[in-house]
């Protein structure tokens, strides 16, 4: 493999044995592609905004004399960029402008004669835009729209599993689900009649539906039944024989062949052998006794030819009398319905008998009554209602997916078709459910991923936009029908408010629009790849059963079987598997390698769950010989959702990678294959809660996916094009682009601005640091700067800690963790949290609030950190209770005494009219002010601080743009100088030229002269562009802010809090091994090895066996080897050994392992590169052990040998307190530990006096309400058991809800009297009132 200059800085040793056929696709593509389809103009009009417009327009007036047509749309440019939107608290969106055409038709002339056409561009609200990282900025906060897994439109057949009826009989049902419109259900009842329901309302016999579709009784019978033909003879009947129909029946008469010999005697059961005999003898007719026909049903009406009287009506039961009537009337032939108990049920026949309607109108009226109970039906209303239910494109749409699923399920060859239902569709569904009831077909599995599809951002936004358009449509139609249209323009007809409101509602408050989890890069990526079955049109937690939540065979390679939340949402919220993607229909697909005649090719095909069932698919870990053939004869594979063994020749596809089945979070767990699934689930979920540490450190033992994840998450800065690093500082990187990657006529400079110390959604700190230096070569895709939780472009969620598995004085009882003081001293788990505190000055009824440093009754010391405007300085260190922003609020005028009036008249004392409502630091917080933002309403005078901040921003913008301009100008000038050198100018001449004159030289060579002129033009454009950009920036900074009504000013203060690790903080490894820190132990007391090196953390070995997450033990051994190799390299460098020796050792490390795919050609590295690599490996060599394809025990032992460590992985340890050796050896190594965002500082809380609940008068609960501790029922029992009567009494009275008692208590304490008199608890009064409300009077007597 070829490594770029920056990749050579540190190479992760990979133990993967399988060749890489396919790289993990871009992780955020599910979000970005979906939204791109929504906003991109689609000429076919099948998706996105275009589809929404085409589905609603043209809008015709009621009279048909005018219509509003849609022509095209365009999205404008957003006013503010993403960062500005976040600071100002506005939505990152672009204005949508639509070109509409109003056509007026001439009433007097022939139909369709156009009288007037008006075209105009109309503003239709703002559409939120997606940022490059797949998020939306809504009101200043980053949000993610989670994709939804919902039941695909189409037709589904199911049964009730015998739960509906007491007999336990299985009742089948069919349901046609459209994308939008009414649901149509068919279901059997316990008596085997077929019923229909529309939108889950009252059920009607299914034949009513057929009658409404203009089928007569005769046609219905012909559709659903075969006939049995009889010829009527004098005493007998002759039946046309279809031998197959007799199978399984008991003969009620002798069955004879054509010659008259008896084949089956009366009373015998007819078997397949008998049927073969009948077929052999070519018997086509069979004489049956007259009684045989009794109880059969007529297949048609029989009419007396003379009188016209109906002798036997269709579907009526035939009796001997009926037969006699038919003979008398001279009717010689009779047809009955072919029905048998086994596989030709009388379902439709029975249904017809309970159907009270006889014609179409009656059926329509019946449906109307069911849909609109209480309304008088008219013929037109009933027809219109039925037509609109399933046959109107405006009200009903199966969608392309629905039609495809519908046709495939009913074996209709074409995948395309109408979006509405046809008569034939409904009949086909009824035939199919009867087919299933007869036992010829199976019901569907609704949890199969072929029956559930993904609805992503673009599709949901399109649906919401359509909802808004439909609201507008009604208003437009009314306006077109009213008023004089000659005066109106399209602008006057359209009101953009409903559209904006629908879109805003979706992005702001939909259940699937979620506040982005921004703890670390992994949590961001996982949140964007989340698939939820909840939300509008989905399931609800309460109703979702076990089956829906369970892992289904079709999840393989599509949804991760590991990563899902614990708790009520388990299995309803899933994560996309690493390689999965959605197809054009929204079904999940996963890639497979094609296998042709037993040879595995590198051709990759994506298969959906439906397609996968048809093929035989082998796993990725099968043995492959040198020719790319399968080495074994019998191969473990999957076919039709079952695991089985098949011959190598039968295999059609093979997995692309062993990591294919799991999500990115799960594939970050090394040695995942050795962990129990429950613990792996916790490990995957807890990595998302890791807080970025002060100095990120890459994991020594990783899985090789760390880099992909860090790059795709968007937190690191990646080079867009190759070149050389020209300039680096903490906030900007400049890359000079390679000549061959330049676009014509550009300066050839890429400038990357870095994000510095900004706040994330979870209050963690986002900060980017450059990881390249000037002069370094860069190729496209190289990491230039690290973000939070990344280290040289690798994801780094925690720290590598030296761990010992041993008990230590009970401090690691029940998963507690003992850590060394050194960990805290070295700031290994110190994290920075940034809090945003806001102070809002409003306009009140009594006057405006004012932000000022002049606050009544506050001492000088409290104001020492404020400037003259009353706002805290940047850099000030503040603690709980300090004033950040001084604010005074007008108080109501109180009635003054004459003396006060006199004093006020003399001294002009007015300060008592305002009260102090300043913004203070919350009690438990202590930190440093890192930024202040002041927003002032338009028209309100800006205070001095606001002006200063504004000037600072303008100066910063001028400096930034100026430097950018200078860099780009230098790029142009250097190219011009190169031209002049080529034209014969000497270096000295060029050096003597002033900068501005370089571009106005005259050259003899015409082409070069033209190039020089082009460069001069470019320079002018740059200058003009700079002025324009600066003007826009200046206008943005100085313009007033758009604040909420009644708000004059908002001051936002950003406070950085440094949190070191302390007892009570939660920590975890990557294998679900979590615990709380119990004690920070002095370094000298920690166990140490023979070299005197103490361990950092002591974990309880009892946490491993019962949890079955052995991966952590292997990680510790591998970590020890990796660190040991790093220590060896360090020793070599410190002893200044020969570089060849260092190179040889590093080469030995990278070549270790059996059949390892990775090849690192250390020999091709220059000495400088080897030295730099060695320096970066001093902390330990990073290792990749991919899930299901990782390092084996043998390789871990080889690594330990290379590191010069015992292959047992265990060391002698000594007790730090006594110096004695522990009685047996201890497993010591390096584990990657995470600090989770469950910090004791956020949870610890104490209450003195605070708020009480209004009804019970008891203290509230929880930190947010400054509440107390609940002393519950069991705690009361505990005190009762100890006989602590007085403690119990005060707990239940004065410390809780005895209102008078607690006031008296306070007074007593103030007076120094420590007595207490408990009274009646308020909750007892509540109980009395409750009992009285039930009508039972209780009165209290004085004792």
Curated annotation (Swiss-Prot):
Enzyme class: transferase
Keyword Transcription: yes
Entry keyword set: DNA-directed RNA polymerase, Nucleotidyltransferase, Transcription, Transferase
GO biological process: DNA-templated transcription
InterPro entries listed in its UniProt record: DNA-dir_RNA_pol_bsu_external_1 (IPR019462), DNA-dir_RNA_pol_su2 (IPR015712), DNA-dir_RNAP_su2_dom (IPR007120), DNA-dir_RNAP_su2_hyb_sf (IPR037033), RNA_pol_bsu_bac (IPR010243), RNA_pol_bsu_CS (IPR007121), RNA_pol_bsu_protrusion (IPR007644), RNA_pol_Rpb2_2 (IPR007642)
Annotated catalysed reactions: RNA(n) + a ribonucleoside 5'-triphosphate = RNA(n+1) + diphosphate
EC number(s) stated in the UniProt entry for this protein: 2.7.7.6
GO cellular component, one term: DNA-directed RNA polymerase complex
A GO MF label: DNA binding
Family of the protein in this entry: Belongs to the RNA polymerase beta chain family.
Job description of the protein: DNA-dependent RNA polymerase catalyzes the transcription of DNA into RNA using the four ribonucleoside triphosphates as substrates.
Assembly notes: The RNAP catalytic core consists of 2 alpha, 1 beta, 1 beta' and 1 omega subunit. When a sigma factor is associated with the core the holoenzyme is formed, which can initiate transcription.
Protein name: DNA-directed RNA polymerase subunit beta
Organism field: Shewanella baltica (strain OS223)
